[in-house]
Every structure is written in structure tokens, then in C-alpha cells.
């Protein structure tokens, strides 16, 4: 059997299916195309496809409406290896300055930190450099100068803060020294001389009640009794210590001047009597 008519029918159906969706190449943006599920009607004026023979179907017209591949891709979308090589070549070479060039640059920088274009060009011709190199050097030199100024100001502020702390410490030490001089310390009280012995100090203070005791009454009876008691107590106390110098000093202090004629001559003359045996034994 001959099945050639089946092949011709399949080719015609494929052609009708492709023409039903319209032309996609005419749209500038593929996302803006809206799909319509309704198929448009076939043109009535066009000749229908014959049932047999696939040579009469206009399949060549469909190829004219198809877009060319990669039509939306821009020019040189994919980078070439030569572009990366050019970027690597654009790296700046570090400039090395000689001592003579640095000397001239520093001299101009001492005069002005911002030289104009004419000064830079003249300096570049003088030291055999380009004007761009001279300009970059001045930019770096100004940055270095500002950094040095900031470091110097920070160091000065730290020194001033240290000086203020030292002054505050000295003032506190001065206040402490003033307080220590005003209030006695335990060591200063220890260096004071010891108080005199009670036996030696009492005879020096005991002659003060003499006029009171003597002026209380004209009679020589009970007046000098307290004096004698104090005298014997002082002699006895002094005998317990050093009997040599202490007793001699005590007797010398109690020896009165020569008494003249008066109401108390009898009383005072009693002190000139020689000490008895009891006193001698206590003193020596």
C-alpha cells in the first residue's frame, strides 16, 4: 500500500500550527508579547493546501520571519583576553627620586605648599621630571606634613597633661608636709627631755608658801613646820637618787641670804644650823 498521503498531511498540519502563533521576531522585547489562545481564522482568499503533495506548501515563507540567532546580544558581550592584558599594563610604575631632585622639591615646598602650574612645570624641567610626577609628589608631601603636625600636637597635649598631674601631686605633698609640721609626731615627743624628778622639783617650788606661813602669826611656833616637812621630804627623796650633786644643789638653793635685823630674823636663822646626825645619814 502507498502511505505517501499521510506524510503530506503531517507536513501541512505542521505548517498551519507554526503560522497560527504569529511572528516573534517583530517584537523588540520578548516579555511584552501576550499569548492569545484563540487562533485567527484562515484567510479566505488564500489557496488551500492540496491534499496530496507537500511541495505546494509555503514553508519557505516561515524561514524569512524567524529572527537571527543572538540578535539581542550587544557587541563584544564576551570579554576578550586582550582586555585583561591591557588592564594589567595600566599599573603605575613607582618613581624613584634622586637626592638632587628631592633637594629641589623640598626647597620649593619650604617656600609654598601649593605651587601653581607654572612653578610645577618649571621645576619639572629643571629636575628632569614630568609635571604630573611633581604634582603627585607635592600631594604626598602635604599629607606627610599634616601627619607630622598631628603627631606633634598629640605629643604636646600629652606633655601638658603630665605637667598638670605633676603640679597637682606636688601641691598635695606640700599640704601633707604642712599638716605634719603642725601636728607633733610620736618621734618628736620621744626626743623631748624627760621631766625632772619629783624630789628635786618640789624644793624649788616649796619656798613660795614661806611668807604666808610666816605672816599668819607673830609666834615662831607652828609657822615653819610645813617648810621643814617639805625640806626633809626633798632631802630624803634626793638621798635616794644621787647623794653627791643632788644634795649639794638642794642645800645651796635653800641657803638664804644673810638676815638682818627684822621680825623674821629668828626664824630664818634656824636654817643656818648645821644638820643633825639624821640628816647626815640621809645625805651621805
From Swiss-Prot:
Pfam families: Homeodomain. Changing residue 256 to Q: May be involved in congenital central hypoventilation syndrome. It is found in: Nucleus. Keywords: Activator, Disease variant, DNA-binding, Homeobox, Nucleus, Transcription, Transcription regulation. Residues 145-284 are annotated as: Disordered. Residues 90-149 bind DNA. GO terms for cellular component: chromatin; nucleus. Residues 153-163, 199-215 have a biased composition (Low complexity). GO terms for molecular function: DNA-binding transcription activator activity, RNA polymerase II-specific; DNA-binding transcription factor activity; DNA-binding transcription factor activity, RNA polymerase II-specific; RNA polymerase II transcription regulatory region sequence-specific DNA binding; sequence-specific double-stranded DNA binding. One of its GO terms (biological process) is somatic motor neuron differentiation. The keyword Transcription regulation applies. Belongs to the paired homeobox family. May be involved in regulating the specificity of expression of the catecholamine biosynthetic genes. Acts as a transcription activator/factor. Could maintain the noradrenergic phenotype. PANTHER family: HOMEOBOX PROTEIN ARISTALESS (PTHR24329), PAIRED MESODERM HOMEOBOX PROTEIN 2A (PTHR24329:SF303). This is Paired mesoderm homeobox protein 2A. It comes from Homo sapiens (Human).
